[in-house]
Regions:
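Serine-esterase "nucleophile elbow" of acetyl-processing enzymes
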Residues: 1-62
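Alpha-helical cap/lid subdomain in secreted, periplasmic
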Residues: 57-214
Length: 214
């Protein structure tokens, strides 16, 4: 689908820890399957779900743009709130690392979804019919987990999955392919919560498959 994509998240969306061009959003931006589309990477290292909410308010009021949106030929200029077709939400890892619960994270995610839908003045069915979609994503597992926080992350992911199914929202599963690759013995992390180049490539493949199905 030729569209404008807004990727809102933290360092996992930003592509922290790998050379420029190897984050999953950047890989999508340079994939010919998305030629003519615009990829706006609004990932900020260390951000929380509340921070994402605050930034989404500014994005929708056209006060903020991604510093360097990845653009390819054929896309008309315009601000994100007017031209955006797809919003992709990936957040909560930093909240969990700060000791927040799965319930807290889920309520914040619901707030983000509500803000997006309310800003356009229409319900989800109308959003999809007009090409203004919403995608939520499951968090990758924590590779370094000294405080046993993966169970909280998994509970949060379960809530996201159920919510997406009940609301009919598109869902990117980043958790399963990264866990399976790690369990298989592949090194897909930099030694902490951030994927390495292979890990981001796996995320890119999962995102590409979902986005092309919309």
């Amino acid at each position: 689908m030729m569209a404008t994509y807004i990727f809102l998240g933290d360092s996992l969306t930003h592509g922290y820890g790998v050379p420029e061009g190897q984050g999953w959003v950047e890989l999508l931006a340079h994939d010919l399957a998305f030629k003519g589309s615009c990829m706006e990477n609004h990932g900020i290292d260390g951000d929380t779900l509340q921070g994402m909410y605050n930034r989404l308010e500014r994005i929708l009021s056209a006060q903020v743009r991604a510093p360097e949106p990845y653009k390819s030929s054929g896309l008309a200029e315009g601000n994100a709130s007017k031209t955006a077709s797809i919003l992709c939400l990936l957040g909560g890892t930093n909240d969990i690392l700060m000791g927040r619960s799965a319930d807290y994270c889920f309520k914040k995610l619901q707030g983000l979804v509500g803000l997006w839908e309310d800003s356009l003045g229409m319900d989800r069915v109308d959003l999809i019919s007009q090409g203004r979609g919403l995608v939520v994503a499951l968090l990758p597992p924590l590779d370094y987990d000294p405080f046993d926080q993966n169970p909280i992350l998994e509970a949060y992911n379960a809530k996201i999955r159920s919510y997406a199914e009940n609301r009919g929202l598109a869902l990117i599963d980043f958790y399963t392919p990264l866990k399976e690759a790690s369990d298989f013995g592949l090194v897909v992390y930099e030694g902490d919560v951030h994927p390495n180049s292979l890990g981001y490539k796996i995320m890119y493949q999962a995102a590409k498959e979902l986005l092309l199905s919309l």
